[in-house]
Amino acid sequence: MNDDVQVWLQYAADNLQAARLLLENGLFNPCLQNAQQAAEKTLKACLLHLDQDVERTHGIGTLARKAKLLCTLDISHEQCDLLDSIYIPSKYPVYSVLPDFVPDADICRTCIDIADGLFQQIQNRVRLAPRIS
């Protein structure tokens, strides 16, 4: 496995673990930030694994569309939209794209599940890839 890919996946794993801990402690905004970041870093690891340039974007939909051109990826357009829609409102108290956005445990669990599913897919793909020396 490419060292850069491994680093991106480790950062994604750390974000997933942080999201779970934050959810357990009722810290919903930082939980959502970490779930989104886990998905973003996982997709960037996938693109690196596929020898693609990694764009400087936080857009889950943008990254997923690029990855889906090169491999099978089980993340829906709606799931990408959800992760994209929570990014700004979970970081800043203004500029929400969701009216009256108030995060709760359910939305946090949903976002963690999406990020974790994506992480498992990419981790398995990278692990099963033939080594090139």
Residue ranges of predicted features:
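Terminal alpha-helical segments
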Residues: 1-133
